[in-house]
């Protein structure tokens, strides 16, 4: 089999149709899966000796949240080291990173695997992986044909990374380096709320504004602060952390501003406070709402004038510190109640950010679950940790009052339980491995008897039309992908669509 010009042109066209990089990457992967007739495909970005999934097709959704470190995945390491097409024999002793991650075939291992390293010049920027359940699935394609596919994918990924770098540089001062511009903590999530949060982080990171990060306990406010710092011009200087809720009143002022020898009993030497430690960098004040009103007044002075006084010292010290503050309280309500200073609130909330709770992030829970599964796999030395369909369904329907932190602990506990009940180093997480409390549901209301306005044939055809429309929308109006989703032959689907009046 050989690729026609039309096939390659179609792949190139799909890359241009997408709105934004994510959509283009998904179109590329979906099209490749159709052209190569593989069971699963993935586009991965290479960064710091790990592969980060950008788009997948035919794989469990939690793969998008996983981070594949080369040390734990010898096949991916082989792809990263290769300068060309890598074909793994069906009897390869190297474990496939996607074993157990093809929906409906969790217990089966991938047989055919091809890896295509992607380069920008001499630099490895990513990889394409193609997997199939038949041992000889890719034998019909020559290395030259696969190189053409890799070249198209590498061009798309390289352009996306270049645009990302240029956009980041435009937000930073002119003397910032490209490396500083793109360096940023990974925040996992594709939900609208997280997408908006990432955009706001990019905007505010390049400035020197104080930021107030609000959100429920366990949502990841510290991770947001870290992302802001690492994407800012201050990234080369320290990010200093202080949990205000853990500060005893007697030592709080010393922790913030430092003290001199003899300032109080036990002050046997001079000591720098967090503000001095964060000079020219960033200070992250977690749980800012827990500070006393007296300390709030002193913190306000630092924000206003940029100088501090160590406890027991009459001299002032100048500091250049950006303050990021976080709280799980509604500080506006705290101001009205007289527990938080209004002037400090306005100083801190120049650019407020809100981290959405996990229950409002949709499928992000599955991506995060995949991330934590991969973490557990590496820590416990397991060959694979996968989520069953029942476990994924449970995670999607639980509300997680403890947010991401609760999910992380739940995954770790489930892995330990599942490992104890299985022999070997492969773990499949089932719903019974999670100890979530029962959720009391309201009694169902009596359903009204529907008024029948169609005969059985009309109702059936209306249902078929709507099902096909939804499948087409989810697959970018690609009929072949739609047929695969509906588990029917594409020719039969075309005939049915014509009979239903959906095609000429």
Curated annotation (Swiss-Prot):
The keyword DNA-binding applies. CDD domains: AAA. Pathway: Nitrogen metabolism; nitric oxide reduction. Pfam families: GAF, Sigma54_activat. The modification 4-aspartylphosphate is found at residue 57. Coiled coil: none annotated. NCBIfam families: PRK05022.1. Required for the expression of anaerobic nitric oxide (NO) reductase, acts as a transcriptional activator for at least the norVW operon. Activation also requires sigma-54. This is Anaerobic nitric oxide reductase transcription regulator NorR. It comes from Escherichia coli O9:H4 (strain HS). The lineage of its organism: Bacteria, Pseudomonadati, Pseudomonadota, Gammaproteobacteria, Enterobacterales.
